[in-house]
Swiss-Prot record:
Gene source species: Lacticaseibacillus paracasei (strain ATCC 334 / BCRC 17002 / CCUG 31169 / CIP 107868 / KCTC 3260 / NRRL B-441)
GO annotations of cellular component type: cytoplasm
InterPro entries the record matches: DNA-binding_RecF (IPR001238), DNA-binding_RecF_CS (IPR018078), P-loop_NTPase (IPR027417), RecF/RecN/SMC_N (IPR003395), RecF_2 (IPR042174)
Name of the gene this protein is made from: recF
Binding-site residues, ATP: 30-37
Localization terms from the record: Cytoplasm
One Pfam family in the UniProt entry: SMC_N
Main location (coarse class): cytoplasm
Record-given protein name: DNA replication and repair protein RecF
NCBIfam families assigned to the protein according to its UniProt record, in alphabetical order: recf
HAMAP family attached to this UniProt entry: RecF (MF_00365)
Keyword set includes Isomerase: no
Amino acid sequence: MKLDHLVLKNYRNYAAVDTTFSPEINVLIGANAQGKTNLLESIYVLALARSHRTNNDKELIRFGSEFARVSGQVSRQSGSHQLELIISHQGKRARIDRIEQPKLSQYLGHFNVILFAPEDLAIVKGSPAGRRRFIDMEFGQMSPKYLYNLSQYKTFLKQRNAYLKQLKYHQAKDLVYLDVLTDSLAAFGAELITARAKLLETMSDYAATIQQDITKGRESLHFSYQTQVDPSLRGNSEQVYTALGEMFAKQQAREIEQGTSLVGPQRDDVLFIVNDKDVANFGSQGQQRTTALAVKLAEIDLMKDQTGEYPVLLLDDVLSELDAARQTHLLKAIQTKVQTFLTTTSLEGIQKEIIATPAVFKVDEGTLARA
């Protein structure tokens, strides 16, 4: 999968961009606050129809403009496709090959990207909510079914929590309606837990191999999926559904008392176990960075495994956060097979023998030009 051509209009600090890219490594070089991250963000938005930096789409529109447009020509094994997003103050419109998509869910999955930014180095020690977002964003790209189940689960979770609050404050008393919401939540929750268990197991295997390679066999790594359902049941969605139903029944009184759902995949987490210890609590900073790198590289392998194609990789000023050994391992792992966009203020310090002939672009005050 490659991004061949990108067109921006009124996006962040870019009035207009129209450029083609190398199918291998593209380096965006420039001083801070010139628009390097904005350009990477636009590629991310083209793929996922949302920003990783803000939940307010209006921030993507250039100051004083009515709309922002992001358009790209993407090459896949199935052929070349034009993707386009128009972001206005009224909302978003998405097109594939100039055909408007009635739902954003029908647009997603046509262009897959993986972003690696400095904040991702903290994924192993960050919050469970951050790790769930990470899982959902990546797995949703790989599987329309996962994305659908996640969307449905969030809808019913919101409705159920609102109804639990009504029950708590005696504004409602119909427990039959609560049972209907609970059953829907258990059904979609079971699908999510089963999918997460399967994908995390595969991803863990990839990450374990990468961790061993980086550390020359000194460190073992595996993922420990933390969910309320017994591990022996997670491979069967019907058994997970039954288990969730039983847990909801046991917790119903407490849930009404607290006005929120206490059961379900919204409480999941993933622990990263290095040499039999939780690296977040017991690992050194070096081990945590190695683990974060292994996790991100495992994402690439998992996406290739699930979709049949490598995603596009976005490296936002992350090389400066890695020492020479980790930097070399990252660049060797992606060399020639993964189209990569990386931002930097200088080519100094980058392993030049690894990226001997990159396409270099100069970013300066919202303009982009070949260097």
